[in-house]
Amino acid sequence: MFYSGLLTEGGRKETDRREAASLRQQRRMKQAVQFIHKDSADLLPLDGLKKLGSSKDTQPHNILQRRLMETNLSKLRSGRVPWASKTNKLNQAKSEGLKKSEEDDMILVSCQCAGRDVKAVVDTGCLHNLISLACVDRLGLKEHVKSHKHEGEKLSLPRHLKVVDQIEHLVITLGSLRLDCPAAVVDDNEKNLSLGLQTLRSLKCIINLDKHRLIMGKTDKEEIPFVETVSLNEDNTSEA
């Protein structure tokens, strides 16, 4: 009887341990299910939970996907303004870079006009000589300016320049040559003077890019060295 009681007590303890382990396992599973359900409930709106059914579109996973997509679209729409601002800044920087590149590609030569040293642009892309209003003011040539006679005629000019007046006799000293040539006055803030193709042809000019020289004349040739474009704006500012 004594041994039987020991066996019975041992079997009861084993049974209790198994039941306790089973209860712990059930509690863990219940907690896991509650956690998953709570996590989904936190992500889903209450109206979405009420409408859950057998349809695939009303399952938690699909509702979450739709909500996530709507949130991303909303963020994308709200982010369009700063993106547009970045694009504008990028375009502005690109425009400034192109302008600087154009200035670096200019061919400049030193000359004299109205007793002042001037950097003139050798412009083979324009037929006419051009001088800006700013350059006219700087050189004191206002009294030589006349109204543009051919108002109905639109000159072919680069960079969408607008002719406002003209100078019939613009005296320019280029090397040892003294030129008396017409020039169109353009509405431009830059203090530029440019020699057009018409004048360059009359001087029988050759542009030597290897030697960086403007060669004038056919028999008695004269070479005018190019001017560095880097100092153009600084020279214009100091001369103003």
UniProtKB/Swiss-Prot annotation:
One term of GO molecular function: aspartic-type endopeptidase activity
GO biological processes: proteolysis
InterPro entries xref list: NRIP_C, Peptidase_aspartic_DDI1-type, Peptidase_aspartic_dom_sf
SUPFAM superfamilies reported in the protein's UniProt record: Acid proteases
Pfam families on file: Asp_protease
CDD domains in the cross-refs: NRIP_C
PANTHER family: ASPARTYL PROTEASE DDI-RELATED, NUCLEAR RECEPTOR-INTERACTING PROTEIN 3
Protein name, UniProt field: Nuclear receptor-interacting protein 3
Native organism: Pongo abelii (Sumatran orangutan)
